[in-house]
């Protein structure tokens, strides 16, 4: 699963805006992200979240807090 897809899945499942650290924690715990497949998960997840905001898939609510668009 791609990092943006994992983040969107977590946000949809939780149904509320979440801080990126909570998104990362839940995605790792649920097995959506494999830390052995993606080195430096933090850096790549933050880049994926920024890309999601640019593409319109996510909305940045406040510093580090995201929700699904629409």
Question: What residue ranges belong to the model's regions?
Answer:
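Charged low-complexity interaction tracts in eukaryotic proteins
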Residues: 1-6, 14, 18-21, 26-70
């Amino acid at each position: 699963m791609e990092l943006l897809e994992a983040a969107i899945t977590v946000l949809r499942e939780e149904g509320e805006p979440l801080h990126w650290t909570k998104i990362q924690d839940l995605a790792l715990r649920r097995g959506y992200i494999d830390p052995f497949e993606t080195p430096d998960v933090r850096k790549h997840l933050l880049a994926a979240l920024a890309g999601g905001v640019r593409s319109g898939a996510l909305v940045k609510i406040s510093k580090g807090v995201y929700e699904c668009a629409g």
